[in-house]
């Protein structure tokens, strides 16, 4: 009866189980399945609020209950397809959906990070191929996952900050960086100073939710990159226009350049020089 009064209580039932760690009784599950289609009447904003509470709860894996009871079929059909997509690949031991659930468990309960794990492989069903040995591959799933994530977050009326952060983490979750200072500086410049450090948590959670095949080697490789990043950050080396020793105003006043698009091009060329050799980040050097 309560579910008929406010369909959002269907989602709340799953959310409470995730927050408090209890099992939902069979009769309640049956009622959830019966009334789940009524969620189509609930506003995107209210669904978003409940989804976030579930995702940042101590048991985000209880999203599986939402799948089993037909809730995600209404609010997140893209996830249902993941629950039905196998990953026959030595690097994986779960299907796409189960891998997503495990990865959410392995990361801190922050809204942006948990949403990034929820969506990081959401594009895999659309990119699946199988080779002659029957091994599944998902080439280009990162870009497709980003596109789908953007659509979902907009559909659920998320704020622009969350959309920006989550889509970038999804786009770069598999980005490979060599453990050398120059390579790390370039990666931070490309990905962003706000996003890059969060990727270590995302990548670690992703690895923890995979098979043990080469897992320790992958973890050590990730730690090596993190150590280099921490060295770069500790030295305060320039990795963006924000900390470049010259500005557009300097180019106009000191180098007799005219305002326009050319200013931006020159600043990026100077940033490239500084990324290669941080010692060049001196105003006098760059204005020569």
Where are the regions that the model predicts?
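Short alpha-helical linear motifs
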Residues: 51-56, 90-91, 187-194, 209-210, ...
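Short, motif-level signal for alpha-helix interfacial/capping segments enriched in acidic residues
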Residues: 97-101, 185, 225, 235
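Divalent metal-dependent catalytic cores for phosphoryl transfer on phosphate-bearing substrates
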Residues: 103-218
């Amino acid at each position: 009866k309560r579910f008929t009064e406010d369909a959002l209580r269907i989602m709340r039932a799953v959310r409470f189980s995730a927050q408090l760690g209890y099992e939902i009784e069979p009769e309640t599950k049956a009622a959830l399945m019966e009334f789940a289609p009524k969620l189509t009447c609930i506003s995107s904003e209210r669904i978003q609020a409940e989804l976030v509470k579930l995702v940042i709860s101590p048991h985000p894996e209880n999203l599986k209950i939402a799948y089993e009871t037909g809730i995600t079929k209404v609010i997140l059909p893209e996830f249902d397809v993941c629950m039905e997509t196998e990953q026959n690949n030595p690097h994986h031991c779960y299907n796409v959906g189960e891998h997503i659930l495990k990865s959410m468990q392995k990361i801190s309960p922050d809204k942006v990070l948990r949403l990034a794990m929820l969506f990081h492989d959401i594009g895999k069903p659309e990119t699946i191929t199988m080779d002659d040995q029957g091994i599944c591959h998902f080439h280009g799933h990162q870009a497709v996952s980003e596109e789908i994530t953007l659509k979902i977050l907009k559909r659920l009326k998320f704020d622009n900050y969350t959309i920006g952060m989550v889509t970038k983490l999804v786009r770069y979750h598999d980005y490979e960086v060599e453990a050398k200072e120059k390579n790390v500086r370039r990666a931070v410049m490309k990905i962003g100073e706000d996003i890059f450090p969060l990727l270590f948590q995302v990548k670690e959670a992703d690895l923890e939710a995979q098979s043990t095949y080469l897992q320790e080697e992958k973890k050590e490789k990730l730690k090596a990159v993190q150590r280099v990043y921490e060295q770069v950050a500790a030295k305060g080396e320039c990795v963006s226009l924000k900390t470049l020793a010259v500005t557009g105003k300097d180019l106009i006043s000191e180098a007799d350049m005219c305002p326009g698009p050319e200013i931006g091009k020159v600043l990026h060329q100077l940033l490239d020089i500084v990324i290669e050799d941080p010692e060049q980040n001196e105003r006098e050097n760059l204005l020569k």
